[in-house]
Amino acid sequence: MGWKTSLILIESKDNNVSDAEILKALGIGEIKSQSDSSFDAFNYLDDGSIAIGRVNGNLVICDGYYITEKSLEMPRSLRLCKEEKALCKLFPNSEMVSVACYSAINYHGYSLIQNGNKLRLKTISDGERARQFGKRTKEEDEIYKGSFVKKRATYWKDDLDPDEDIGEDQMMEDFTFEMAKRRLGVRLDGADGMEILNEPFIKYFPVKPIKLTEVDEVPKKTSWKTYAIIIALVLLWQVFKRLLF
């Protein structure tokens, strides 16, 4: 199955924060309409809506990358983005896990916030090295146990073909859904996860649809900046060689 998923999972056992408060905190404007949905709609949410529900003692926001693009892709540190700060004000003593993945480019990213402090952030996509800040979580430690390093990159052996190595970006489902399991209690891509996909959600359609951005836009920008620097250095070296020799 292909995945294009973006979720914010917030510990919310008391369940005393309304959807209206959440939408306001996220800067979502006037709502044009809403419709009943289910958690199953969290995959491929790309219609300009945002969905909210409650699952296993957690508030779950399906955001179509509206928040996670800012909280996972753009940061270059463990600082909170504006939307994360707003959510932390509503849930000051809660744990918050954000996860996102996109099968087409082997992209996955996730972060962990506790008591208003971001403790972990990692993103990776096809052809890119992992960008990460903070200490690994216990979920990550379990996955990395079976890994090895080759040419400064992390790999795993393919269970079906021991001669093949699996790159870190190809471990998308393991990292994404193990981190989500930290809050939900089950893996969404497993048999147990099927049981919670019928949990009721409400999809909200703002008058001004939320702006969706391709998750690989920032890595591409970063790559072009890197290439530009390399080209500039090569040109400078050529100039210096002519001057010196």
Could you describe each region identified by the protein language model?
Residues 14, 67, 127:
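Short loop/turn segments at secondary-structure transitions that flank enzyme active sites
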Residues 237-245:
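Juxtamembrane boundary at the C-terminal end of a transmembrane helix
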Residues 120-218:
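Long, compositionally biased intrinsically disordered terminal regions
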Residues 27-119:
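Short, intrinsically disordered low-complexity segments
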